[in-house]
Amino acid sequence: MAAVALALATGAGCASRSEVEQLKKDVEALKASQAQMAKQLGGARPAQQARALPASIDLTDAPFKGSPTSTVALVEYSDYECPYCIRHFTQVMPEIQNSYIATNKIRYMFRDFPIDELHPQSIRAHVAAHCAIEQNKFWDMHNRLFTSPGTHTPEALTARAQEIGLNTAAFSACIATDKYSASIRQSTAFAISMGANGTPFFIVGKFDPKTHQLTPIKAIPGAYPFSQFQQIIDAALANK
């Protein structure tokens, strides 16, 4: 809901009535999703999930790019169908890429946070990303998924796989299984347990390349402008 609230706060002046009504519906759907996930986490209400960040986060299997030895990391919990996540990908991520990732100043990692109630096709898109990992093409698929929202049918995903040079038979067989759904939902549950109310959700922290453990420094709960990331990342780099 943080991203939705941010959009209402920053864009209400130019939004149509239908757009505002849709945002309200998104908020209600996300509340329902959070309540359902809270039950899976032990019956706590959504408000009770807002808590301090954990002392450590295990990121052993998280796809990453940037410096393999950097001790400062940016972790994104995101949804391939979320409009605010897509906006971040198209407008803010290129600046982060150029300023921090391509220059090997930080390690950037991606984690799953699909919200089924808002985006029914999203879980399938996240499964496709995991299937691409099997053929060492995660980032190629990741980029295709964010630039083709709303077209995450099995046929469309197979077309994306062909575009990036995957073995489409192996890929199609992979997305037809359910072997990654549990880990994707665990990632979503973990994000909510940290107080994430919506997507995207980011954490900047100190990373140990040997143990793959992240010590969180600061959470960024929403699709904020590059300047917000710059301020927090620069502070972390100055104190590494």
Task: Name each region found by the language model.
Residues M1-A2:
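Bacterial N-terminal signal peptides that target proteins for export
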Residues A12-C14:
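N-terminal Sec signal peptide cleavage junction
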Residues S16-K24, E28, A159-K240:
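C-terminal cap of thioredoxin/glutaredoxin-like
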Residues V20-A47:
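Post-signal peptide N-terminal segment of mature Sec-exported envelope proteins
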Residues S56-V72:
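A short beta-strand-turn-helix
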Residues S70-A73, T103-R107, Q135-D140, L166-A170, ...:
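Loop/turn elements at helix/coil->beta-strand transitions in domains of secreted/extracellular proteins
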Residues Y77-D79, R111-P114, N143-F146, A176, ...:
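Active-site-proximal beta-strand/loop segments in catalytic clefts of secreted hydrolases
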Residues Y80-Q162, A235:
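Structural alpha/beta surface segment adjacent to cysteine/selenocysteine redox centers
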